[in-house]
C-alpha cells in the first residue's frame, strides 16, 4: 500500500521496548514514522492533561531506528498527542498508533489507560487510531504484536475505518505460531479487589500504595453483537482481541430503562 504517515505514542515512556518495537515494525513496512511519547512512565494516567506546569519536548531520535523522528515529552500521553498534532508535526498523520503497552488494556480498564487515551485523542481529532497492548506485564517479546498491529491497521485502512472509531488490540503473551485467530470482541466489565497498602514516611506521615486484583469479569449489557466474545475471554484463549470503541458514551438502553424522576421544579 502507499506509505503512511504514522504517529506513535504510548504511556510506558520513551525507553520502553514496546514502542520501539512498534515504531521499527512500522518503518520496516515502508511507512514514515514519528514518535511523540512521554519521557518517563505514565501508565494509568487516563486522559489527563497538564495544565499547571509547562510541557517540554526534546528530540529522542537516537533511541529509535534511523529515519524515525522522535520526541520525548514531559506530559501525559494525551498531552503528547495534542502537542504532536498541533505543534510538532508539519501535517496531520494518516494513522495514530499507541503502544505497544507492557500489559493488557482489557474491558473497562480502558478508562484508566494512558495508552488508550493517546489513541482516543487521535480519534477525537478525526484520525484513524489504534491502541496496542501485550496482555502480560512480564512478557517482553513484542515482535508478534507489532507485526499484527501493522497488518490490522493496513487492512482496516484499505477497506473502511469509520469516523470516531478507535480500535483496541490486545495480543496474548505467546509465540506467533501458538497464537489463536484474531477476533472482534466486546469490552468486558472488570471489577477489582482494591488494595491499599499503608506505609509511614520518616516524618511519621501515612501514605498509601494502591494495588488491586481483578476478581470478576462481566459481559457488558450494552448494544453490540451478542455472539462476539469478550476481550478478556479472547485473551484467556490465547487469541488476539480487537475491540471497536467510540468516544460517544451516551446511554443506548432506552428511556424505559432509566429511573423515573418525580421531582418538583
Curated annotation (Swiss-Prot):
GO terms for molecular function: 3'-nucleotidase activity; 5'-nucleotidase activity; exopolyphosphatase activity; metal ion binding; nucleotide binding. It is found in: Cytoplasm. Its main location: cytoplasm. It catalyses: a ribonucleoside 5'-phosphate + H2O = a ribonucleoside + phosphate. Keywords: Cytoplasm, Hydrolase, Metal-binding, Nucleotide-binding. Binds 1 divalent metal cation per subunit. Its EC number is 3.1.3.5. Disulfide bonds: none annotated. InterPro entries: SurE, SurE-like_Pase/nucleotidase, SurE-like_sf. Its cofactor is a divalent metal cation. Signal peptide: none annotated. GO terms for cellular component: cytoplasm. A divalent metal cation binds at residues 11-12, 43, 101. Pfam families: SurE (PF01975). Belongs to the SurE nucleotidase family. NCBIfam families: PRK00346.1-4, PRK00346.2-2, surE. PANTHER family: 5'-NUCLEOTIDASE SURE (PTHR30457), 5'_3'-NUCLEOTIDASE SURE (PTHR30457:SF12). Nucleotidase that shows phosphatase activity on nucleoside 5'-monophosphates. This is 5'-nucleotidase SurE. It comes from Synechococcus sp. (strain CC9311).
Amino acid at each position: 500500500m502507499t506509505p503512511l504517515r504514522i504517529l506513535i505514542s504510548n504511556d510506558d515512556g520513551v525507553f520502553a521496548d514496546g514502542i520501539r518495537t512498534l515504531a521499527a515494525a512500522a518503518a520496516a513496512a515502508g511507512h514514515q514514522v514519528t514518535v511523540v511519547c512521554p519521557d518517563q512512565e505514565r501508565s494509568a494516567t487516563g486522559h489527563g492533561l497538564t495544565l499547571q506546569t509547562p510541557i517540554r519536548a526534546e528530540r529522542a531520535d537516537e533511541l529509535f531506528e534511523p529515519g524515525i523522528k522522535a520526541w520525548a515529552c514531559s506530559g501525559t500521553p494525551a498531552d503528547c498527542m495534542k502537542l504532536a498534532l498541533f505543534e510538532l508535526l508539519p501535517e496531520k498523520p494518516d494513522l495514530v498508533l499507541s503502544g505497544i503497552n507492557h500489559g493488557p488494556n482489557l474491558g473497562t480498564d480502558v478508562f484508566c489507560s494512558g495508552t488508550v487515551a493517546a489513541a482516543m485523542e487521535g480519534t477525537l481529532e478525526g484520525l484513524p487510531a489504534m491502541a496496542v497492548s501485550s496482555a502480560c506485564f512480564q512478557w517482553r517479546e513484542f515482535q508478534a504484536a507489532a507485526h499484527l498491529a501493522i497488518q490490522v491497521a493496513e487492512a482496516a485502512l484499505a477497506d473502511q475505518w469509520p469516523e470516531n472509531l478507535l480500535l483496541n488490540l490486545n495480543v496474548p503473551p505467546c509465540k506467533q505460531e501458538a497464537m489463536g485467530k484474531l477476533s472482534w470482541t466486546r469490552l468486558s466489565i472488570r471489577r477489582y479487589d482494591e488494595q491499599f497498602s499503608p506505609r509511614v514516611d520518616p516524618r511519621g506521615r501515612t501514605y498509601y500504595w494502591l494495588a488491586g486484583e481483578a476478581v470478576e469479569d462481566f459481559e457488558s449489557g450494552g448494544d453490540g453483537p451478542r455472539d462476539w466474545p469478550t476481550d478478556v475471554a479472547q485473551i484467556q484463549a490465547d487469541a488476539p482481541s480487537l475491540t471497536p470503541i467510540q468516544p460517544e458514551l451516551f446511554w443506548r438502553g432506552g428511556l424505559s430503562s432509566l429511573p423515573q424522576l418525580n421531582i418538583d421544579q
